[in-house]
Regions:
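Alpha-helical recognition/docking segments in bacterial nutrient-uptake
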Residues: 64, 100-130, 138-140
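Short secondary-structure boundary/capping elements
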Residues: 75-83, 100, 122, 154, ...
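Short active-site oxyanion
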Residues: 93-97, 114-119, 226-229
Length: 256
């Protein structure tokens, strides 16, 4: 299997792009479904980019910027809801939580029970939802500059509020993960904020779907041993799951 996937990747890299039919012809003893699964795996680890009817080579620098929040909020919403639901049982009444910015964490905030919680968030949309929909919860916004792409606040003022607040559980997001780079973000200021949160939180739960595997963004904010629980989906490669578990990460998977 590994040799076949390596051969597929090499062919796509050499030719720049290839159709599924063209790739199937390279392995006449394998079904088109098998080849499509191989392409899906290669796309998940960032080796190629899927296209309609085939795949193309991964371009240098591709995926190195944050996508717009409004582009992500309606993508894979059912999967994000299943992942967010798996995080809810970890929430206990009268606890202090940090909720990171992101489309999955927004769904988590929507599902959050009204349990007299103290919630700090870097996301203005999450703060607004908590303030208007969870009457027994207190909400604090980190402050700082608002990034229009990610709907996240960071920078000046955010460190001060973090220094004064103890966090029981941080529910984090990540823009990418690779074994070499760890968990990564696309903005330096947001990376600094995430690092501060990790230093204050008793427990860190990270929600990240398997499409982020192999996507290496510019700024590392966490290594595997700093994450207690990863909530992801069944698309996570078994080899990566095993290595995360070896480093002490509990992996919980939603059906993809």
């Amino acid at each position: 299997m590994t040799e076949r996937r390596d051969a597929l990747r090499a062919y796509i890299d050499e030719h720049g792009a290839a159709s599924t039919g063209e790739l199937c012809a390279l392995f006449p003893d394998r079904s088109p479904m098998t080849i499509r699964r191989d392409l899906g795996y290669l796309a998940r680890i960032g080796a190629i980019t899927r296209t309609h009817g085939g795949a193309r080579a991964f371009r240098r620098g591709e995926g190195q910027h944050e996508s717009f929040y409004y582009e992500r909020e309606n993508e894979n919403t059912a999967l994000k809801r299943r992942m967010a639901a798996l995080a809810i049982p970890f929430v206990e009444a009268r606890r202090s939580l940090f909720i990171d910015s992101g489309s999955t964490t927004m769904i988590f905030a929507q599902l959050l029970p009204d349990k007299d919680l103290t919630i700090l968030t870097s996301a203005p949309n999450i703060a607004l939802h908590i303030a208007t929909q969870k009457p027994t919860c207190s909400v604090l916004l980190t402050g700082g500059a608002v990034n229009r792409n990610t709907l996240s606040c960071s920078g000046y003022g955010s460190a001060e509020i973090l220094q004064s607040l103890n966090i029981d559980i941080a529910f984090m997001g990540a823009s990418g993960f690779s074994e070499a780079g760890g968990f990564t973000a696309g903005e330096h200021a947001e990376c600094i904020l995430k690092r501060l949160v990790l230093g204050k939180a008793e427990r860190v739960i990270l929600l990240m779907d398997s499409s982020k595997i192999g996507r290496n963004m510019p700024y590392t904010f966490a290594r595997a041993p700093e994450i207690h629980i990863l909530i992801t989906d069944t698309g996570l490669p078994a080899s990566i799951e095993e290595r995360l578990q070896e480093k002490g990460v509990q992996v919980i998977k939603a059906e993809r």
